[in-house]
Amino acid sequence: MQEQYRPDLIEAEVQKYWQENKTFKAIKDTNKEKYYCLSMLPYPSGRLHMGHVRNYTIGDVVSRYQRMIGKNVLQPMGWDAFGLPAEGAAVKNNTAPAKWTYENIEYMKNQLKVLGFSYDWEREVTTCRPEYYKWEQWFFTELYKKGLVYKKTSVVNWCPNDETVLANEQVHEGCCWRCDTPVEQREIPQWFIKITDYAEQLLGGLDTLPEWPEMVKTMQRNWIGRSEGVEITFKIENSDETVAVYTTRPDTFYGVSYMAVAAGHPLAERAAQNNPDLAKFIQECKNTKVAEAELATMEKKGMATGLNAVHPITGKPVPIWVANFVLMHYGTGAVMAVPAHDQRDFEFATKYDLPINQVIAPVNGEDIDLSKAAFTEHGKLVNSAEFDGLDFDAAFNGIADKLERMGAGKRQVNYRLRDWGVSRQRYWGAPIPMLTLENGDVVPAPLQDLPIVLPEDVVMDGVKSPIKADPDWAKTTYNGRPALKETDTFDTFMESSWYYARYTCPQYHEGMLDSEEANYWLPVDQYIGGIEHATMHLLYFRFFHKLLRDAGLVSTDEPTKKLLCQGMVLADAFYYTSPTNERIWVSPTKVTLERDEKGRIVKALDDEGRELVHAGMTKMSKSKNNGIDPQEMVEKYGADTVRLFMMFASPAEMTLEWQESGVEGAKRFLGRLWNLVFEYNKNPAKTALNPTALSGVQKALRRGVHKTIAKVSDDIGRRQTFNTAIAAIMELMNKLTRASLAGEQDRAIMGEALSAVVRMLYPITPHVCFQLWKELGNEDVIDFAPWVQADEAAMVEEEKLVVVQVNGKVRGKITVPADMAEDDIKQAALADENVQKFLSGLNIVKTIYVPGKLFSFVAK
């Protein structure tokens, strides 16, 4: 055994062993309990970042631990390989997206291997490969046949100069990112999947996921947004037309003073035909892309249409306005406005001098000032005819009943969730498998024509999708008749919605899934990824699982039992201001720091001597140039050190602050462990450990070893507090470093302790532990060694410390045998000199004994 810890000599050799021996190959074995651990698959952007490393290290620790406790573990890895960044990179680097993507995959795969993750690489999935998306295309055609897929026009961002659709992130301040042309809103036909048909299941399923973070479940509940209300039909004055609105507050119905409709509403379009000012306003609204989140804060604007609706109960006219805060794709595209009891309606009514009619009063009878703000709480009805005096529930039901009797309304459950638009007008995605015949009929491509392959050898001009630019690509036949292929491609969330299931049978070519394999491995036991995916990927992934279940491909209701959302990785960020007043961000690796006695940064200089501003700890990002390259850290410190720091520096769900001093500390710790094994191996134990022959000091040390085993087992296995597990191992290591190796039983305890420490650290730092396990004389490799078990007998305390109180104040501490009786403890407490002093001249009136902890005297 070499004297110094040299990760550069160990890690590559161990990784080579794992690769040659296919150590982590997962094979279905019905005699063993399975465990499927999965980290969200990465987009192959070119290089791993520290966020990836954190996510995958957590997954690897869980996988290796579960393997050691005897489970049949599957931990796969793959690539979410379609997506917009590849198109931009292809134009920039004058290459094809496929070539750029495959090169990135090779590079990043090597980076993952260097970090020592225990993946079964034979199950690798790359979502841009035709053999993968063939089955996605097939499944889409099956959903179409079931009536779960439809096509309708939808609003998109359109660049009139490039004549192309832009993703939201390609719109910068209302203009095209490429040519700076103002972006228009256009309606084009798009494909949708009916996720709304599953809204109730998606909502109810959250109650069956006790091991998901509450925050994620709350975010999904809010996103699905179930509400109970009434859909009310208003007639249009002097017309046969009607307009429907949905409200969750029918109790306020007598307070309606106007109606607001979206710019795209048919009533708005009709009114604009003879009103140029209104037509201009509508066009402005349509060209202003408004995210739902911005609605609350933006300036409310509107214009009267000149049309009136008729209040179904009172018969009074209700003016109809076009308003910029009503979105056509939410609800009916029309809202009834009650300014007295809705703040947004109030602001609009105040601005345009519309009536504000109070119909709800506080239950406590207090007056409200409707000149300042709306009263939005529930209360009792006023100015509401026969419903006056009713509370919210009674009024809801009473008014809903009346509207239903009149044929002017119906109770309805609504969802905020909208159907999933899966069309993208981009090139680098899976082609949507639909065909248009000469007569205009649209049909799904038959299985024998799948996959519809995306051509990979293309030239990107940065403007038009190559498959849209090439009319020949779309030409095909259907049952001998000419047809055209769809030139839109799938939203890339499609691929990441079912990859977890394909990992169970990636080489299966007879269908989308081999149900036998899928039902053995699924559901995923542990899923790991960022909370930013809560309402997109994690919702689509749950939805897709239910679609797979209903197609008979999987048997469970949910895709994963347990979810862990790891925190972000932060690093110090530094900048200086250029002569043109621009912030120039400087990489922390190029900064020299001065710190005060508390370790706070007081001065920062770049390598040219410029004084920098410290912007604090922020999320590692390209924009702030504060990312740390994992590869550089692995080359400098070794993979095990990087992994150890990642797991120790912070609880898994919390943000992690990258500190290179902490990485250096992790390296020193592994060096100490190596050194301890080296010293022990100079004179290892030659006789077996004899627990009955140990001294008090030896028993105490061994007790510490087994208490640490118990704590680490609980911290890793149940609590998933990996940082506290490592802290406990470090504390034990401090004791072992000071322990004697003089006697044979001392060395036997040390041998047992080192064997335990190496096994406990193996999931976290597998390379060094692989080597140390061999150095400790074990024949088998550690990869198949069982997890270390705590010896209950060794943890029993022989003595206990009892605190002695007199009249509620601590007056002594006594050490007594662990099995000492209460009366004997009382006598031992009375024998303590300090206790005697405080009891002197007093009569004991009461004693209280908390077994093994406290003996208290009450005396007067």
Swiss-Prot record:
Reaction equations catalysed: tRNA(Leu) + L-leucine + ATP = L-leucyl-tRNA(Leu) + AMP + diphosphate
Protein origin, superkingdom: Bacteria
UniProt main location, coarse: cytoplasm
Keywords on record: Aminoacyl-tRNA synthetase, ATP-binding, Cytoplasm, Ligase, Nucleotide-binding, Protein biosynthesis
Gene Ontology cellular component list: cytosol
GO biological process, one term: leucyl-tRNA aminoacylation
E.C. number: 6.1.1.4
Keyword Protein biosynthesis attributed: yes
UniProt record similarity statement: Belongs to the class-I aminoacyl-tRNA synthetase family.
Protein name: Leucine--tRNA ligase
Chain's gene name: leuS
